[in-house]
Amino acid sequence: MAIGQASHEIAATVLRLAANGELAPDFTLRGLCLLAQADRLGSVADDNQEFLDRIELARELIAGEGCMDRPYPFGSPRTQRALFKGGSVWRDQALYDDSWGEVILTCGLPGTGKDTWIRANCPGLPVVSLDDVRLELDVTPTQSQGQVVQAARERARALLRQRQRFVWNATSLTALRAQQVGLFEDYGARVRIVFLETVWDENLRRNASRRDAVPEDVIDGMLGRLEPPERWEAQTVEWFCV
């Protein structure tokens, strides 16, 4: 790998990590470095000094990118998204947003209140719901979901071709949600990921009251696979504790 390309990728990684401060205001790369240093100082290992030297190098890189204590202030949300997707853009320029509208993608375990949030915040928008597709196709949550996802994606494509804003209502628990984000962006939409979470007991209570309750052991398995969305995954990412 060429040195220039490697430097570009390292800088992009630093900027992506720092951007998570938009989702969790107490998060900073300064704090992350301090945590890594404390963890290493509390352990006994032959490579301790080498690891500590790497932390100091990371601090220098982060300071050079101007995001030690805050996310980098990009020229525009479109510029930020372009860089996070790997584009070679100047981070301070204000790229024009040529998207035709926004598609919302929900993320969260069953019972976190995705349907309630959609009703309160997206009145009038079409909703592509994987739960509804499952009911129509008579597929349970424990069965293969391939045909469910395919049918939902076809409905999404129909709306995208019409340049119709809509909500993609699914658990979207892992980084594979990038496939959906990529589909929506390929059709010229900008994407907002909305991540909802709640305490475990409340999560189970809400799920039990649903018409199509998901077995608790299935939700427990989903929790083990959950990867909360990071800020770099879409043009807008929001976290809500509900």
Predicted regions and their residues:
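Conserved GTP-binding G-domain of TRAFAC-class P-loop NTPases and closely related GTPase folds
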Residues: 104, 124, 201-242
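Conserved substrate/cofactor phosphate-moiety recognition/catalytic segment
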Residues: 115-166, 200-205
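C-terminal subdomains that position terminal phosphate/3'-OH groups for nucleotidyl transfer/ligation
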Residues: 1-87, 92-94
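Phosphate-binding P-loop
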Residues: 93-100, 159-160
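Glycine-rich phosphate-binding P-loop
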Residues: 102-122
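Short catalytic-loop micro-motif centered on adjacent basic/acidic residues
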Residues: 165-170, 193
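Conserved phosphate-donor/acceptor-positioning beta-strand/loop module used by diverse small-molecule
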Residues: 187-206
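Acidic, metal-coordinating catalytic cores used for nucleic-acid/nucleotide bond scission
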Residues: 168-180
